[in-house]
Amino acid sequence: MKKSYFKWGAISKRQAKVLTWWKKGSRYASYNGIIADGAIRSGKTVSMAFSFVLWAMTTYDHNNFGMCGKTIASLRRNVLGTLKNQLRARGYTATERRADNLLVVTKGNRVNMFYIFGGKDESSQDLIQGITLAGVLFDEVALMPESFVNQATARCSVEGAKLWFNCNPSSVTHWFYQGWVLKCGKRKLLYLHFTMEDNLTLSEETKARYRSQYSGVFYRRYILGLWCVAEGLIYLQFAEDEQRYMIPQAEVPKLSYIEIGADVGGNKSNHAYVAAGYTAERDVMYVLKAWSYKATGVTVTQYRENLIKFADGIREQYGFVDTIWPDCAEAAIVNELDAHSPYNIRGSIKEEILDRVRCADILFSQDRIKIVEDECEDLCAGFRTAVWDDKHDDKPLDDGTYDRDVIDAFDYSMTPHITQLVRG
């Protein structure tokens, strides 16, 4: 048996309830499941996953269970590594068969199978059809499509099966909030709301660091743990104090990476280019230059010539350009640049738009974005006026009332390094 390196610290009352609600004698033992939502770093996942397997191993033998994440990779990263150590520390054998996406847990003569699923899109429901389950754990259920969750819950036909949900909050109109959180009583589900105070292993310094990472809707969701609507200005911190982020060109340090994001607008919008630089550490984003101009009447050749001229100016000023990232949806533009440009051309990395906004929010919150003054007015104008769409959940308004194209170009210059930027 592999040696376990997991050691439990002090646990909060909510974590203790997660670990015991299903046990004989508990007032909740007859409930159909549990929902644990709330803030990031609040101790939900570590207690939910362990309790799920502990319940399964205590209650069943030779049965199948489901463990679901947004992707299989994210579930392995966020749940399985710690979970296997937790189980080994309690005398269980936990063997992962990666080729089968299966975790086999045994203790004595008792064995159960935990199948791993990813629920990233509507087609994911097909992956879970046909199997009979005695219970399912949904890690970050708010990131999954309703069809996948409905299919997974329908697989739980074994007597006494229970459903386990955890997530960070999203919009109040989200299907999970409307259909499960608000109806937890009717569905006979235990509902627990977590904050960072429920994670007794976090120091005050660590909690303060997490609080400093977010503002606006992300602060309300990830720090306060509230289900809420994204509304108003998207880049509120910039709009309230833009001088806080401006620097003269002379203060740009030696850069190790320079990326140019290039958006392609329609006839009634703009073409836009944004150049961003990063030091070797990639902990600060330096916005070097931005240019946005009307797209009407601009040919593919003219677009290419304008972009090369923009890139030439950056190379002359800073010595190099790593990559130009044109909108990957515009194949004609990408092909034109690839065939007739002296620069390295790659289609843009289109992260989920909410993840892009969240990264920018972290950078603004922690003063880790610096904008070269007098070179980025088009982008600054976009930051000042960008708002959420009040008719579509978690979507920026894109009706031409502000320059969305220059912000998309900004995003494309950021996403090649988004993982390092979020980590700080």
Model-derived features: positions:
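Inter-Walker segment of RecA-like/P-loop motor cores
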Residues: 76-133
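Short beta-strand scaffold segments in enzyme catalytic cores
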Residues: 270-277
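Catalytic acidic motif of RecA-like/P-loop NTPases
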Residues: 73, 142-143
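Pre-P-loop entry segment of helicase/translocase ATPase cores
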Residues: 1-33
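ATPase catalytic-site recognition across NTP-hydrolyzing enzymes
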Residues: 199-265
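Conserved P-loop
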Residues: 31-101
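ASCE P-loop NTPase helicase motor core
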Residues: 135, 143-213
